[in-house]
Every structure is written in structure tokens, then in C-alpha cells.
């Protein structure tokens, strides 16, 4: 594992949480001084196995990532004017380092989402979550200590011209080399009567994305689900589905052999993503299907809004409610479950099975 987690092993500790992984270098260390600013404000972040980051906040006014910036190493100042895409990327490791970047890295490590040699299709819907995920993955790929490849995949399920233009414009602004392919999903969902259009749309989207990603030689697709999605889904399954289950950080595809789905923003809170978008003056696409344009409320969206409201209300009495919901799914005690299944295809087991076995002993 040295090749993956490098510095963590040498420091004798496992990088278990997003916070607390970094050490501040002493400015007096000549080898780590910034020649552009004389060592003022140099900070060396040691992010085990995912690329070292040196951020200079001194008079040099430049940022060197992984120590690989030639201009910075040789003492030449880089142009201070950065593109919107560069500013958005830089903000991930500066202003939003704790709230976004560290949590993104923490999720990738804790759940082993990315491995050497992976070819990952980042699936971009045009919303804030997937767009920010794409920038995180782009930055990580540049400075990771092990090689992996990334494709930026956009499916057009029937967007209106203005909505598609918004996605393309944001991709240009963020300097994301997207691949766009088309599917008839909106038209199909629009004609289906009854059932949940959001559920059907999500299932069809995933199938098309798996298929296109596999055709590009990818072994994983990355989706933009975040911390809030996880806890809201957990509550929805209990209150609306009469079962206890959650959104996993990764899973194997059942219909596409060798393919996996990963959720690198698993530990990132939605408020951080919203703030990042506003900070960089970005406007993202909302749900743009024809069904929701004609309907004031639809079942799944309404239920999710209700979960947001419920969690916010409970947090007024206990500020740790959200993290406790999240952690509860990491600490399930099956011995206290009246009934359980070990997967969607498994039969329902009762606590009486083992209870009666103990009586016979």
C-alpha cells in the first residue's frame, strides 16, 4: 500500500478522517522555501499518496501544486491573472480546502473509491454537484501519486437548447473536456403513465451512462451524490419505504460486468458545494425534464424536500442529528433487528431463526 498511501504509512498513522492530515512546514527549512517570496507564508500540505500540495501565500502570490510548478521552483513569478476555471480549481484547495477538498479526499480514501489504473467516467448532469465533482476529479488526476484516467461524460436526455447551452458554457468556463452523447430518456419518461418519473428517469440514465462509459473503456462511473443525499435517502427509506437502507459509497453494476459506481462526494456537505458555486459566480442547471416543468410537485422531490425540512428542524434541538444519521448506517447491529435481508435478492430473515437455535443448545 506504500505506493497508494505513501506518506501516511511513513508517518505511522492511517488517514482515517478528512481533517487533520496536514502538517505545516517550517519556513526556516531552506529546501521548502519559496524562492519567489523568500519563504514567506509557505505551507506544505501532506495529503498521503494523493499528491503533495505546496500553497504559497506570501509575496510571490503564486501556487505550486505537488512541487511540480517549474516557474515557482525557479523563482519566476507566474501571471497573476488566472482564468475562471483555474480560479474555481484553486478555490477547492484554498478557500474550500476543509469543507470540500479534504472531505473529497477522505471519501476516496476511506471507501477505496479510486485505484491505480482506473479509468473513470465522471457523469455530469449539469447540476452543481456533478460539475464540482468533475473539477475535484480533474485536480486530483493532475497531482495524484498513482495513475488513473478520467473521462467527463454528459448525457443529453432531451434538454431544451438553452439548458444544453448552459451545460456547455459551464464546461468551457471550468475547462472541462466533456463528451456529450444523446438519449431519448425524457421522451420515454414523458409518455409513461403512473409510477415515479424520477425513479424511472434515474434508472434509465444510469443504464445509458454505464453503457457509454464501458464503450469508452472505463471501469467506473462517478456520480455527484453528497453527504446530504445520503442521510436524506436513509430517512426516506424508513419513512416512505418501510425499510432501512442507505446510499452506498460504491457498488458493483448488476447489468454491466466489471463496472462499478462510485460516489466521491460522500463526505461533502451540500452547503459547501452551494457556497463554492456562488463564490465562483457559476449558475448551474436544475432538474430540466419536461415532467417537472409541468408539475408543481412530484413525489420523490417532495419527499426529499420534506426530509431536508425535518433534518433542519431536528438540528435546532441536536446539532449532531445529521452526522448521527450518517454514522448510524456505519454501525448497524443486526442482533437487534427483528428482520433483515443480506441484499435485494435475499429472502427476509427473522431474529427467531437464531433465537430458536439457542433454545435447542
Segment roles from a protein language model:
Residues 1, 52, 197-204, 287-296, ...:
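Functionally engaged cysteine thiol sites
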Residues 2-38, 44, 49, 53-69:
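Short, low-complexity intrinsically disordered segments enriched in small and basic residues
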Residues 10, 79-244, 248, 271-279, ...:
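ATP-dependent adenylation/nucleotidyltransferase module used to activate substrates
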Residues 72, 78-79:
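Basic/polar N-terminal segments that are highly enriched at the extreme N-terminus
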Residues 97, 101, 164, 206, ...:
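A structural signal for well-ordered alpha-helical scaffolds and beta->alpha junctions
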Residues 149-150, 228-310:
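Catalytic subdomain that performs nucleotidyl-dependent activation
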Residues 202-216, 250-256, 309-328:
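Short, basic, helix/turn surface patches
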Residues 282-361:
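The feature marks non-catalytic terminal segments
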